[in-house]
C-alpha cells in the first residue's frame, strides 16, 4: 500500500493505492480510496482550543445540575412530597404521614419506623409511585377548582340536590298503592274481582248542613265527581237498601266513603322498596233495615260470621301483600243477634252453665222476639 499525492490535489486529499509485493509495475496498482486532507479540521480545532472560557461555563453548568440533583434526590429517594392542599407540609407518599422537619435523615427515620420495606424498592417502582402522586395532586387541584361553582348552583335550589336527576335509593319512599273499594258486588268470587292498581285517591266526603237538606237527585247533579261511585253499586245492594228519599248520612253505603284511620297509618313510607299494599275500605251501615244486607253479603262471600256481636270493631280492612295470600279482615259485626233461630230449639232442656248468668233464658227469649220482627235476609232477593 502506498500513499501518493497528484498535482494540485495534493493539498486537498490523499490517494490510496494498493500494489502487489511481487511486481513493481505501477500499472498494476489499483486506486482504493481518496482521503481528504485533515488540515482544515486541524486548524478549526486549534482555533477552538484558544478561548478557554467556554469549557469553564459548561463545567459550571454541570456542577449546578449535580447540586440540584443532589438536592431533589433525597425526596425522590425516600418518596416525600409536598401537601397538595398548598399548606407546604411534607408528606410521605407511601402512608401519607406528615414529616415534621423534612430532611433526608428524618425521612429515613420515618421509613425505618413505619414501613422499612420501602427502602428496597426498585427505581422503576419509585418512579411509578412518584407519577401516581403527581397525577393525584393534579386531580385534587382540578376538583378544588370546580368546587366554588357548585355552591352557586345549589344556592338556587336551597342547597338540596335534584331528587329526579340524582335519586337516592336509601331515602326513596316505598311505593304503596292503596285501593279503596266499596265491596259493592259481593256476589262475585274473590278471584274474579278486578285488582287493578290505581293511585291513591281519597274522595272528600261532602259536608251536609242539617238545616238545608236537598233531594237526592239534586245533590248528585251538584257533585258530579261523586256520581261514578254510585254507578258502581250493584243491583243486589240497591234492592235491599232503604229507598228513603232523604239524603243519607256520610256513614251510609250510598254515600262516598272516606279512608279510615288505618289507611293513613300505612302511607308513611316506612315499608321497604317494592312493597305494595292494597287496602279495601268498607263503610258502616246506618239503618236497621240495612243490617240484614250486611249479613247477606258475608254469606255470599262465604266468610265466617263473627261470634262476638257485642264488640264494636272499626270498618273492615282486607289487605294483600303482593301475590301472597295474606288477608286481614276486621268486619263490622251485625247488629242482628245471631240467635234468631234459637226459638226453634227447646229451651227447657238447656241448663245454666258455670260462666252463664242465671237469667240467660230470659235474655234469649227477648232476643228471639226482637228477631221475629225483622225481615229475613233472603226476602229481598
Curated annotation (Swiss-Prot):
UniProt keyword list: Chromosome, DNA damage, Isopeptide bond, Nucleus, Phosphoprotein, Repressor, Transcription, Transcription regulation, Ubl conjugation
Residues with PTM Phosphoserine: 122, 149, 249, 252, 310, 313
Predominant subcellular localization, coarse grouping: nucleus
A single BP term in Gene Ontology: regulation of protein ADP-ribosylation
Crosslinked residue numbers (Glycyl lysine isopeptide (Lys-Gly) (interchain with G-Cter in SUMO2)): 49, 190, 221, 291, 295
Gene Ontology CC entries for this record: nucleus; site of DNA damage
Statement: the UniProt record of this protein carries the keyword Metal-binding: no
Changes seen on gene knockout: Mice were born at the expected Mendelian rate and are viable. Mice are however slightly smaller and display reduced levels of poly-ADP-ribosylation. Moreover, they are hypersensitive to ionizing radiation-induced DNA damage.
Compositional bias annotation for Basic and acidic residues: 219-229, 288-299
Pfam families: zf-C2H2_12
Ranges of compositional bias, category Polar residues: 148-158
Annotated spans, Disordered: 148-170, 203-270, 285-320, 335-381
Residue ranges, compositional bias (Low complexity): 304-315
Subcellular location as annotated: Nucleus; Chromosome
Keyword Metal-binding: no
Subunit text: Interacts with SPIN1, SPIN2A, SPIN2B, SPIN3 and SPIN4. Interacts with TCF7L2 in a SPIN1-dependent manner. Interacts with PARP1; promoting PARP1 ADP-ribosyltransferase activity.
Chain's role: Chromatin protein that stabilizes SPIN1 and enhances its association with histone H3 trimethylated at both 'Lys-4' and 'Lys-9' (H3K4me3K9me3). Positively regulates poly-ADP-ribosylation in response to DNA damage; acts by facilitating PARP1 ADP-ribosyltransferase activity.
Protein's name in the database: Spindlin interactor and repressor of chromatin-binding protein
Lineage start: Eukaryota, Metazoa, Chordata, Craniata, Vertebrata
Amino acid at each position: 500500500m502506498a500513499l501518493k499525492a497528484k498535482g494540485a490535489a495534493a493539498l486537498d486529499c490523499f490517494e490510496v493505492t494498493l500494489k502487489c509485493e511481487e511486481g513493481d509495475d505501477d500499472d498494476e496498482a489499483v486506486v482504493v480510496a481518496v482521503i481528504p486532507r485533515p488540515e482544515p479540521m486541524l486548524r478549526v480545532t486549534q482555533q477552538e482550543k484558544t478561548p478557554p472560557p467556554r469549557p469553564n461555563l459548561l463545567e459550571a453548568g454541570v456542577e449546578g445540575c449535580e447540586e440540584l440533583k443532589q438536592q431533589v434526590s433525597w425526596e425522590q429517594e425516600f418518596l416525600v412530597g409536598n401537601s397538595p392542599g398548598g399548606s407546604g407540609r411534607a408528606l410521605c407518599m407511601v402512608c401519607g404521614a406528615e414529616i415534621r422537619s423534612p430532611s433526608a435523615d428524618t425521612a429515613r427515620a420515618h421509613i425505618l419506623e413505619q414501613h422499612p420495606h420501602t427502602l428496597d424498592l426498585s427505581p422503576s417502582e419509585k418512579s411509578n409511585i412518584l407519577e401516581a402522586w403527581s397525577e393525584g395532586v393534579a386531580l385534587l387541584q382540578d376538583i378544588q377548582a370546580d368546587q366554588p361553582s357548585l355552591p352557586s348552583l345549589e344556592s338556587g335550589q336551597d342547597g338540596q340536590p335534584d331528587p329526579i336527576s340524582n335519586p337516592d335509593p336509601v331515602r326513596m319512599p316505598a311505593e304503596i298503592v292503596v285501593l279503596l273499594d266499596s265491596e259493592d258486588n259481593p256476589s262475585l268470587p274473590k278471584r274474579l274481582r278486578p285488582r287493578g292498581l290505581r293511585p291513591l285517591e281519597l274522595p272528600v266526603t261532602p259536608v251536609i248542613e242539617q238545616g238545608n237538606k236537598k233531594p237526592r237527585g239534586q245533590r248528585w247533579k251538584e257533585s258530579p265527581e261523586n256520581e261514578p261511585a254510585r254507578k258502581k253499586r250493584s243491583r243486589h245492594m240497591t234492592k235491599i237498601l232503604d229507598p228513603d228519599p232523604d239524603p243519607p248520612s256520610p256513614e251510609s253505603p250510598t254515600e262516598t266513603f272516606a279512608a279510615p284511620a288505618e289507611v293513613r297509618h300505612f302511607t308513611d313510607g316506612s315499608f321497604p322498596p317494592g312493597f305494595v299494599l292494597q287496602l279495601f275500605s268498607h263503610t258502616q251501615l246506618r239503618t236497621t233495615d240495612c243490617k240484614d244486607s250486611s249479613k247477606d253479603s258475608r254469606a255470599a262471600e262465604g266468610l265466617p260470621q263473627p261470634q262476638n256481636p257485642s264488640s264494636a270493631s272499626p270498618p273492615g280492612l282486607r289487605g294483600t301483600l303482593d301475590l301472597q295470600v295474606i288477608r286481614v279482615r276486621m268486619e263490622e259485626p251485625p247488629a242482628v243477634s245471631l240467635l234468631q233461630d234459637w226459638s226453634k230449639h227447646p229451651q227447657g232442656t238447656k241448663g245454666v252453665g258455670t260462666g252463664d248468668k242465671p237469667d240467660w233464658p230470659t235474655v234469649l227469649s227477648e232476643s228471639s222476639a226482637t228477631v221475629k220482627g225483622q225481615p229475613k235476609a233472603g226476602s229481598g232477593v
